[in-house]
Amino acid sequence: MAPKMKAAMKAMKAPAMKGKAMTKTGLAEAWRRRPSFLRRTAGQSWRAWPRSCAAEVKKTGKLTIPGLVMVKTRKKPATKAGKREMFGKVVLVKASCQDVVKAYPVKALKTDF
């Protein structure tokens, strides 16, 4: 592996965990606590799911949906600031870092296929 690649991989690190990852029961409770959520209405649960999952990923940096998928966030290092020519004009580019969100299949899902 090239030295630049190794340095880039070392620079990528998981964000600091602010809390404990939500369990299956915690996820069900988050759905139940949503305003105007009724057990009989399946449509509302599907609308509440993305909001609950997004909030959990923002809070802890990862979320596991048992038997399906694990979502993780990674911090990518900042790109270098500088000047670049675009269409004959000099453009100033700011240094920017990113939080990358990736989803991985869980082992139980891999073995089923």
UniProtKB/Swiss-Prot annotation:
Source organism superkingdom: Eukaryota
Entry keyword set: DNA-binding, Nucleus
GO molecular function (one): DNA binding
GO cellular component: nucleus
Disordered as annotated region, ranges: 1-20
Location within or outside the cell: Nucleus
InterPro entries: IHF-like_DNA-bd_dom_sf (IPR010992)
Keyword Hydrolase listed: no
Keyword Cytoplasm in annotation: no
Protein name in the entry: Major basic nuclear protein 1
Gene that this polypeptide is encoded by: HCc1
